[in-house]
Amino acid sequence: MNDKLQEEHNEKDTTSQINGFTPPHMSIDFHSNNNSNIIETIGVSKRLGNSVLSELDSRASSKFEFLKDQSEQQYNGDKNNEPKSGSYNINEFFQAKHDSQFGQMESLDTHYTLLHTPKRKSQHAIPQDRSDSMKRSRPSRSIPYTTPVVNDITRRIRRLKLRNSLVNGNDIVARARSMQANSNINSIKNTPLSKPKPFMHKPNFLMPTTNSLNKINSAHRNTSSSSTASSIPRSKVHRSTSIRDLHAKTKPVERTPVAQGTNSQLKNSVSVFDRLYKQTTFSRSTSMNNLSSGTSAKSKEHTNVKTRLVKSKTSGSLSSNLKQSTATGTKSDRPIWR
């Protein structure tokens, strides 16, 4: 029963029987000209299969022709121009090529192993075993202690050391001198250093300079010469006063003797600060009233006449004057403001 079912299945399955072969024992002949059967067995589309197979055939044919020509030339060279035998097979050429290239290839073990540089062996190198055995075979010799030979030089050096070590009178003097020198050095070291100069000096603008002193001296000379020339101070002469009145008013000024020890420059000397920062000009804030009051205060010493600055007439003052004139009854032909 099972045999019948297997036969029926084999008859229905047309794809499994190709050229009378069953699938488990299927063999494909790629060198046959019938390429359609190969494509059907593989299961690739005919268009793709034909293009791939044609490309492979063209490459194989070109490679085969190139290798065939090369093999014929090598065979002719090996035989030394002997007649070509028909028994020569191209497979031998491929095998020889393969063997030569395969022999030149590097093995995997040697390719992937780490490179170790071998140590250089010295020419006089002795094996470790031999060196140990030689050391053991040698008898151990004890090195005897040898005292140094005493010469005349060593004796003289010892004598000099003994002489220096002995305390004599000369040594005491030398030690005293050295101690004194050391004490002098220590005293020099212990002396305090001189005070450093101050970093910031005192300002010089408060001290009198040579130019200021010269100016003061010249001013003092001028004042002394003027006092000797005219002892009587000149007073302002008014036109109304007569010469007799002037003689009656002026009195002789008594001269006060100046002490010789006192210096007149100290009285007239002015500090640089006062000369630099003293205000000698009028400020802009001063008004005409202040000036008039200042001048009147000065003039009071001589005369009792009050000086007054007349203000300019304005339209308001003119109109008030007109009203007053009309009130009193005085008539004017022309107005004052004209």
Curated annotation (Swiss-Prot):
Q: Does the keyword Transmembrane helix apply?
A: no
What residue spans carry the Polar residues bias annotation? Answer: 72-88, 284-297, 312-330
Biased composition annotated in UniProt, kind: Low complexity: 216-234
Q: Name one GO biological process term.
A: cell division
| Assigned keywords, A-Z | Cell cycle, Cell division, Chromosome partition, Cytoplasm, Cytoskeleton, Mitosis, Phosphoprotein
* Stretches the record annotates as Disordered: 1-29, 67-88, 116-146, 210-263, 284-338
- Output compositional bias ranges, type Basic and acidic residues: 1-14, 242-254
Q: What Gene Ontology terms describe what this protein does at the molecular function level?
A: microtubule binding
Keyword Cytoplasm among UniProt keywords: yes
Query: Phosphoserine (modified residue): where?
Result: S165
> What Pfam families does this protein map onto?
Msap1
Q: Name one GO cellular component term.
A: cellular bud neck
Q: Which InterPro entries match?
A: She1 (IPR031401)
Q: Where in the cell is it found?
A: Cytoplasm, Cytoskeleton; Cytoplasm, Cytoskeleton, Spindle; Bud neck
Q: Which family does it belong to?
A: Belongs to the SHE1 family.
Primary role: May have a role related to the spindle integrity function of the DAM1 complex, which is essential for proper chromosome segregation. Causes growth arrest when highly overexpressed.
Q: What is this protein called?
A: Mitotic spindle-associated protein SHE1
Gene this protein is translated from: SHE1
